[in-house]
Amino acid sequence: MRRCSLCAFDAARGPRRLMRVGLALILVGHVNLLLGAVLHGTVLRHVANPRGAVTPEYTVANVISVGSGLLSVSVGLVALLASRNLLRPPLHWVLLALALVNLLLSVACSLGLLLAVSLTVANGGRRLIADCHPGLLDPLVPLDEGPGHTDCPFDPTRIYDTALALWIPSLLMSAGEAALSGYCCVAALTLRGVGPCRKDGLQGQLEEMTELESPKCKRQENEQLLDQNQEIRASQRSWV
């Protein structure tokens, strides 16, 4: 039976790949959080109307992106722990649950951001400033003219460009989070031997690798202790 090409986790290179994916998720999650914070501080806080309602673009671009970024960091940390503890089933199940939730959230975030970008491009950014410019829903009226322009606390001509400049990288980050979370799901299923990615003998190979790594770690620790003792003795002789 031919295995799916997505089931690429093996005993030789799988743990190192999982560690790299965890580090990438932590990095991408922090970048997405930063983009969401900058987007809120520079653009989207201006488009909240006085009644407390917000535009759909705000909800899609800020709330979901921030949630996806936070969860991506958590999945990355669990992936790092799982890559160093390959024989602990609870970590595998936690990784599977968090990665699956983050996969769905990242896909929803990507689709929402794509919708927000499409709507904003289609109406030329007028939907973003509709509360500040009630009369500018007419595409024939320039953004820097029309009723309500003098009451705006920000420059309406920069809202459109700034929003797109931050939304598009956030969209790419969300797509990357979805792909990395999908790999974590595959790795967790493979480690547990569940689904089409099940590999016979994988647990035995991992146990052998763990047994081989333990003497090496102990040998390295002993060598470090010997080096430290030699340095201490050399320093004592120099003082004498």
From Swiss-Prot:
Signal peptide positions (record): none
Cellular component terms per the entry's GO annotation: membrane
Compartments in which it is found: Membrane
Membrane topology designation: Multi-pass membrane protein
Regions that span the bilayer: 21-41, 63-83, 94-114, 163-183
Tissues of expression: Expressed in skin, pancreas and keratinocytes.
Protein keywords: Membrane, Transmembrane, Transmembrane helix
Family: Belongs to the TMEM54 family.
Protein name: Keratinocyte-associated protein 3
Species, as recorded: Homo sapiens (Human)
Gene that produces this protein: KRTCAP3
